[in-house]
Amino acid sequence: MAVNDTPKVRTCGTMPVHERLLRTDPVYVAARNRSENAHWEAIARGGPVGRAGVTTIPVVVHVVWNTAAQNISDSQVHSQIDVLNRDFRDTNPDASNTPAVFAPLVADGRIQFELASSDPAGLATDGITRTNTSSDSFSDDDKVKSVASGGADPWPSEKYLNLWVCQLGGGLLGYAQFPGGPAATDGVVILHTGFGTNGTAAAPFNFGRSATHEIGHWLNLRHIWGDDGNACNGDDFVADTPNAAGPNFGKPTFPHVTCNNGPDGDLFMNYMDYSDDDSMFMFTQGQVARIQTSLDADRPTIGVG
């Protein structure tokens, strides 16, 4: 694939990053165990109990560019923040396309996002950093997250959501680090042609849903098919998402039945599937409960002051 091509299908690098950290970082393994224990404890007591109302998360967008086109505009950045605020508050108009049988599952994530107004030193900022790099493209090896390797250093992850926007190779649209990983690499990386709704954003990933998907991972959501190939044995640890054989690509039609999940089939319109941007438009109540538990247990300092 040429460096500047937009992938034809969604590819997410979060699980390879997760598996690498499980192999190499015992601190991450312990943190993941604590995170999942907190999730199951919250289910046992009937739901998360920490935060009430809406959490506002400060965001810093690190634009790491090699060509002028990759140095995306402020307008493109703002368009992505707008998408996130609609998607995580269930105010996106296309949520009305949810099939009637799944409509009762749709939930408000109770999270909103704003570009940071102060930097780590307390100085005023527009929440966007720009770094010219000699690297033609990046991968899921986290080099984009460090000045020393051609990227941009993160702001403190206990206060900010770090979003890196760059050229990704290998067909990647983006990747995230689940809660519990190293602070130096915490955050989300998105291909610039899959970021926002204008500028370099290109179909079929020009509705800003790649960032919605990856921030879902950053908030501890899994892919809805459970990442087990096509075995129908995987689990996303959320009870109200139907079991699915594997990822759905493109623009599926309802119902798409797999894993004996008829008559209604897969929840392919969920943000944590692999459908095109215009075919995903909802989180479920169970996913929101998991997100809120992750804020309580994994990210207790973010969005609270």
Segments (PLM) and residue ranges:
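Short, histidine-centered active-site or binding-site loop motifs used for metal coordination
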Residues: 61-65, 194, 276
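Metzincin-family zinc-dependent endopeptidase catalytic domain
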Residues: 78-250, 255
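Soluble non-cytosolic domains of exported or imported proteins
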Residues: 71-79, 202-206, 210, 266, ...
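N-terminal zymogen propeptides
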Residues: 1-54, 88-89
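Short glycine/proline-enriched loop/turn "hinge" motifs that connect secondary-structure elements
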Residues: 49-54, 180-183, 263-264
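Fold-level signature of zinc-dependent metallopeptidase catalytic domains
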Residues: 38-85
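Soluble periplasmic/extracytoplasmic beta-strand elements of cell-envelope proteins
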Residues: 58-62, 162-164, 189, 271
